[in-house]
């Protein structure tokens, strides 16, 4: 999965982009914070699974 697609998925599921510095987006939902780096590449499968698990999308 591309990092842009992951960012889009999180935004569609209620996460808000509260801050961006360079290519790093800080997303927030219900006192949870997740940082997604958007470099135009595929997200490694282990990192993708960890992010999806922490954001309760998996």
Task: Describe each model-derived feature in a short phrase.
Residues 25:
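Short aromatic-glycine-enriched beta-strand elements
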Residues 4, 12-16, 28-58:
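C-terminal structural segments of small proteins and small subunits
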Residues 22:
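Cytochrome P450 catalytic-core helices
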